[in-house]
Curated annotation (Swiss-Prot):
InterPro entries in the cross-refs: Ribosomal_uS8, Ribosomal_uS8_CS, Ribosomal_uS8_sf
Quaternary assembly: Part of the 30S ribosomal subunit. Contacts proteins S5 and S12.
Organism field: Phocaeicola vulgatus (strain ATCC 8482 / DSM 1447 / JCM 5826 / CCUG 4940 / NBRC 14291 / NCTC 11154) (Bacteroides vulgatus)
Claim: Oxidoreductase is one of the keywords in the record: no
SUPFAM superfamilies in UniProt: Ribosomal protein S8
Record GO biological process: translation
HAMAP family named in the record: Ribosomal_uS8_B
GO MF term list: rRNA binding; structural constituent of ribosome
Pfam families, A to Z: Ribosomal_S8
UniProt KW keywords: Ribonucleoprotein, Ribosomal protein, RNA-binding, rRNA-binding
UniProt name for this protein: Small ribosomal subunit protein uS8
Similarity remark: Belongs to the universal ribosomal protein uS8 family.
Keyword Ribosomal protein attributed: yes
Function as written in the Swiss-Prot or TrEMBL entry: One of the primary rRNA binding proteins, it binds directly to 16S rRNA central domain where it helps coordinate assembly of the platform of the 30S subunit.
Amino acid sequence: MTDPIADYLTRLRNAISAKHRVVEVPASNLKKEITKILFDKGYILNYKFVEDGPQGTIKVALKYDSVNKVNAIKKLIRVSTPGLRKYTGYKDMPRVINGLGIAIISTSKGVMTNKEAAELKIGGEVLCYVY
């Protein structure tokens, strides 16, 4: 697999479109950090790391509106790919849907949202947009 982050986002997208409640994805440290950000920002209901084998899996419980069964995540867009990396400085931090969404940035201080990176005045690789 050449792009595990794109695979992770695609698994989430497919589970959302199929209206699944829980999706299992192969674990990695970067995927754990992205999942933690999605949980902290309220895009997913819950997550759990399960150690089964050398790598383990992450069980992600998706968040749906109780009235009209709409998911909290409208779009997941992969920005930086292995073939074309996208970097940004803290002055040029992307605004996703005029501040309503988040960009997940991989920085020297770890994985964080665009707002957190701008507050710390550090740039990094733009992994994906979530809204």
